[in-house]
Amino acid sequence: MDVLVPFAAREPKTRLAGTLDADERAAFARAMLLDVCDAVEAAGGEPTVLATEPLAIEQPVVVDKRPLTPAIDAHLSPPAAVVMADVALVTPAALRRLFATTGDVVIAPGLGGGTNALVVRADGFTVDYHGTSVRDHRRAAEGAGIDARSVDSFRLAVDIDEPTDLAEVLLHGDGRSADWLKNAGFRLAETDGRTTVERRG
C-alpha cells in the first residue's frame, strides 16, 4: 500500500521547545520520521514522505509547502494510507492490522482527538486535519455515504508532541527515537506517582 508520511521539516515539534533546542528538535523529529518509515516498510507499505522542505533520506520525498490538509488531499490517491511522522511507538504489526481492516475509510484515532493514521480506499473522500480531526473524518465519511471504521491501537494513538510524551518513547520504543533520547541523556523518572523524564549530563 502507498503510504504518505507528512513531515514538518522546518521548525518541527515546537511544543518541545522548553525541553529540546531547535537543532535537537530537528534531530529527534527526523529519528521519529525514520522509525515510522521503517515500520511502514516492514509492514509491506511503500512510504513517501510529504515534507515542507527537501530532505536527504532514503525514502521518496515530495515537497509541498501548503498546510497539512490541502497538501495531503493533493497527493493522496486511493487506495492509500496516511501515517503521521510522530507516532514513534508504531510497529509493523500495528500497521499491518490497520492496512488489513476493511472499510472505505479506516481511522486510527490519536489521543486528544487527532487522526494519527488513515486508510482511504474510496474516491471522493477529503481529509480535514484541523481541530478534532477524528470526529471530522467520521462526519465527512458519513456525509459522503462512505463506510468508515476505526482501529483501536495504543501504538498508533500516541503521538509525540509534549515533554510528557517523551516518557512513552523510553517506556515502549525500541528504535531510533528511543536511542536518540537515551544518547541525549534522557532517563525515566517518577514524579508524584507519574512516570516522566529527566535529563542528565
Curated annotation (Swiss-Prot):
<keyword id="KW-0342">GTP-binding</keyword>
<dbReference type="InterPro" id="IPR029044">
    <property type="entry name" value="Nucleotide-diphossugar_trans"/>
</dbReference>
<dbReference type="GO" id="GO:0043814">
    <property type="term" value="F:phospholactate guanylyltransferase activity"/>
</dbReference>
<comment type="similarity">
    <text>Belongs to the CofC family.</text>
</comment>
<protein>
    <recommendedName>
        <fullName>2-phospho-L-lactate guanylyltransferase</fullName>
        <ecNumber>2.7.7.68</ecNumber>
    </recommendedName>
</protein>
<keyword id="KW-0547">Nucleotide-binding</keyword>
<keyword id="KW-0548">Nucleotidyltransferase</keyword>
<keyword id="KW-0808">Transferase</keyword>
<comment type="pathway">
    <text>Cofactor biosynthesis; coenzyme F420 biosynthesis.</text>
</comment>
<dbReference type="GO" id="GO:0052645">
    <property type="term" value="P:F420-0 metabolic process"/>
</dbReference>
<dbReference type="GO" id="GO:0005525">
    <property type="term" value="F:GTP binding"/>
</dbReference>
<dbReference type="InterPro" id="IPR002835">
    <property type="entry name" value="CofC"/>
</dbReference>
<comment type="function">
    <text>Guanylyltransferase that catalyzes the activation of (2S)-2-phospholactate (2-PL) as (2S)-lactyl-2-diphospho-5'-guanosine, via the condensation of 2-PL with GTP. It is involved in the biosynthesis of coenzyme F420, a hydride carrier cofactor.</text>
</comment>
<comment type="subunit">
    <text>Homodimer.</text>
</comment>
<dbReference type="Pfam" id="PF01983">
    <property type="entry name" value="CofC"/>
</dbReference>
